[in-house]
């Protein structure tokens, strides 16, 4: 008589577990293949989340950059700052000189700021502002054929004071120049702040910042190259220049809502109004 073996019970829990593992593997492989062939797509789109609103806001901030300069202070920290002022009845940043003249030989619309903090480093910077902008006003008044506009904006975010000075200069028949100067100062530590320190404060890696800047500059130059081929006279950027590396960037500031602005004002050293603005939006 042939022995009868007992029937094994089917382990449905184990089958379900294997099935789930199989499905997860298939999804993982599918996602990897998708990212391989569509790596330029945003991950948010894959999950039904788009960044179109952020992109619209980003472009709006860039397009409205020149309208920021209203000759005043935007202090997001309220009155919780303790600084030793030069003049107690003035704000931390105020207008030191104002020139609004329209003469036959020149036109001036100039507001020159002063940082109202009593320490040696700030005094040195205030003197630089005086030497740069007031001296230019004096030169223009003794000359002819000039249009000179100077405006500023100051922000205080995270104990960092950021002063930005925007100037436009039209000399006779030459092209207009647009120039930007910035000054960033840690009010709590009484020292100037580097761009790298600001990026660290915002948890932005320097390598990521470099990549973003390079990509945006490259995209702008590619568009300019296309327009140049059509016969337009476009400003040429050297996309491989080290001026686009974080350690070498001179003009930057923390603006409204904690957004970090990086500015390449080519008029600072060329006869041009061309300027690039790269913004790291605060999340």
PLM regions with names:
Residues 2-6, 10-22, 27-283:
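Compositionally biased intrinsically disordered regions enriched in Thr/Gly
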């Amino acid at each position: 008589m042939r022995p009868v073996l007992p029937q094994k019970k089917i382990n449905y829990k184990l089958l379900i577990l294997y099935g789930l593992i199989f499905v997860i593997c298939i999804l993982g492989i599918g996602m990897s293949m998708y990212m391989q062939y569509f790596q330029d797509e945003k991950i948010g789109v894959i999950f039904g989340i788009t960044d179109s609103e952020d992109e619209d806001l980003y472009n709006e901030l860039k397009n409205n950059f020149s309208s920021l300069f209203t000759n005043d202070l935007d202090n997001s920290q309220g009155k919780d700052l303790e600084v030793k002022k030069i003049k107690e009845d003035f704000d931390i940043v105020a207008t030191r000189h104002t020139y609004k003249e329209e003469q036959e030989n020149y036109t001036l619309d100039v507001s020159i700021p002063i940082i109202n903090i009593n320490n040696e480093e700030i005094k040195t910077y205030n003197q630089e502002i005086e030497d740069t902008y007031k001296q230019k006003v004096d030169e223009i008044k003794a000359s002819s054929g000039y249009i000179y506009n100077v405006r500023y904006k100051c922000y205080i975010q995270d104990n960092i004071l950021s002063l930005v000075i925007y100037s436009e200069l039209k000399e006779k028949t030459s092209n207009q120049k647009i120039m930007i100067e910035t000054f960033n100062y840690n009010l709590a530590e009484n020292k100037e702040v580097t761009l790298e320190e600001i990026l660290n404060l915002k948890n932005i890696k320097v390598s990521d910042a470099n990549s973003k800047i390079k990509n945006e500059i490259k995209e702008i130059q590619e568009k300019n190259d296309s327009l140049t081929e059509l016969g337009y006279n476009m400003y040429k950027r050297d996309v491989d220049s080290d001026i686009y590396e974080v350690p070498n960037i001179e003009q930057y500031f923390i603006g409204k809502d904690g957004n970090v602005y990086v500015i390449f004002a080519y008029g600072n050293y060329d006869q041009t109004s061309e300027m690039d603005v790269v913004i790291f939006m605060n999340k």
